[in-house]
Amino acid sequence: MLFCSVRILFIISSKQLVLISETEVTTTLTLHTTHKIESPTANPPQSKKNLFVIRMELLSTINLLAIALVLLVVPKIYGACRILVWRPWMLSRRFKKQGISGPKYRILYGNLREIRKMKNEAKLMVLDPNSNDIVPRVLPHLQQWKSQYGETFLYWQGTDPRLCISDHELAKQILSNKFVFFSKSKTKPEILKLSGNGLIFVNGLDWVRHRRILNPAFSMDKLKLMTQLMVDCTFRMFLEWKKQRNGVETEQFVLISREFKRLTADIIATAAFGSSYAEGIEVFKSQLELQKCCAAALTDLYFPGIQYLPTPSNLQIWKLDMKVNSSIKRIIDARLTSESKDYGNDLLGIMLTAASSNESEKKMSIDEIIEECKTFFFAGHETTANLLTWSTMLLSLHQDWQEKLREEVFNECGKDKIPDAETCSKLKLMNTVFMESLRLYGPVLNLLRLASEDMKLGNLEIPKGTTIILPIAKMHRDKAVWGSDADKFNPMRFANGLSRAANHPNALLAFSMGPRACIGQNFAIMEAKTVLAMILQRFRLNLSADYKHAPADHLTLQPQYDLPVILEPIDG
């Protein structure tokens, strides 16, 4: 192929030179004739010799350029063919030998067009509020391909192979037993702008170092000190509600998902970073807009380097990212320039202490701190806001359970006592409701892991570079694991703890499991208990007739049309 390309360019170059030479010869002869009249001593053979030398030098230069061009282009063409054609064909063939099939790969796009089409159609669905079978709406492609190809199948996100596995025992191996062989999967640049390249996405030794530094911030002793801040922020939300109804004790219409997002953003900003309400809300607003941009790009085709092009969406993402970075830098600078003797013992203080460490395994750079701040600002408010939102919906639909929880709160906290860490730990029924809410409406629909080397997983041979997708929204509704009532709201399944709630001890994956399980899960549960206990002390929750049950995948599971709730004040 290389020889043919050079030969073609050589022939083309030769023909062009012949034309050039003929023109030059004619011109030279004309000049020579004129010169001959003027100077009888001219030497025609010498001119022809010079012309021949020029021609050969030019020909040699062009051929060298042609060879260099071929040497540059051919590897690129080979690499593109390998990624676009040969690798998908080879991997599909390798999995087919193991009895695993899936939708047909299409060059460049994979199955992205099919996924986009199915998701757009599913967005038009409005479900029965009493139906918890949300998978056909939020994961329509996985639902359809599972019915066609079985529990384990292969599909393509562009040129990225994705192996969908629904087996709980294999999930345990991926997330726990063999977690060192599975890193976090490749992430789109716009998502990193939103959630930061922090603990969620870093891999290898960087993850080990970050986790070791951050663990103390989420110890139970530290969490107990944060409950008063959670209470203060919740009272601030109640005050806003009171202003909206002009101080009158009457029923109130509230878009509760929006309210919970603002509340949890306030709590994470105050408890973890010691920032003011205004600064925390600025970060929250910018991340909310970034989240919309990222959700819209979930099924877009990704090209390496496209994030550097000044497209309208990229310009919007850059602008929002700069706003987030500026807000976080102001929070960090305020802590660095404070007159306090140390940086404090909250999350930000622990990270800034690490920045001044002389030990490499305990050190964090300022850039890493900024990325971790993005991570905890986003994940820290999004997880709890979603848990509170869906729990509120379920309690509004199941008034009997709402009354059971209110009675428990009155027994442990009284009707007006402020909840603290000790009373929160006694709210056992509330804990079962939260676990059931996380099972049915967990914030994350899938867990993704990338095979870092060729390996054996159960009876499967997994090639290096394969992305494993665990469809936990589907796995949480597996009747073989959770029983015949898997689609029903039944908190009592968790009455004897997580390990006995299903036929597999690690069936609940809302916070993942293993070494990379969510570092902030205890913070999220304590925060949710504090907020819900205070709400149940003061209000009855009723679902508005305007509510449309349309859970949607916006990076996390959210109600597409928010959650309109009627707050009914409790007398006395």
UniProtKB/Swiss-Prot annotation:
Transmembrane segments: 58-78
Residues annotated to bind heme: 518
GO cellular component, one term: cytosol
CDD domains to which the protein is assigned, alphabetical: CYP709
Primary residence: membrane
Topological type in the membrane: Single-pass membrane protein
InterPro entries the UniProt entry points to: Cyt_P450, Cyt_P450_CS, Cyt_P450_E_grp-I, Cyt_P450_sf, Cytochrome_P450_Monooxygen
Cofactor: heme
Phenotype upon gene inactivation: No visible phenotype under normal growth conditions.
Tissue expression summary: Highly expressed in siliques and at lower levels in flowers and rosette leaves.
Entry's induction text: By salt stress.
A GO term, aspect molecular function: monooxygenase activity
Entry keyword annotation includes Translocase: no
Alphabetical UniProt keywords: Heme, Iron, Membrane, Metal-binding, Monooxygenase, Oxidoreductase, Stress response, Transmembrane, Transmembrane helix
Database matches in SUPFAM superfamilies: Cytochrome P450
Subcellular location: Membrane
Record EC number: 1.14.-.-
Pfam families xrefs: p450 (PF00067)
Functional summary from the UniProt entry: Involved in stress response. Does not function as cytokinin hydroxylase in yeast heterologous system.
Similarity annotation: Belongs to the cytochrome P450 family.
Protein name in UniProt: Cytochrome P450 709B2
Gene of this entry: CYP709B2
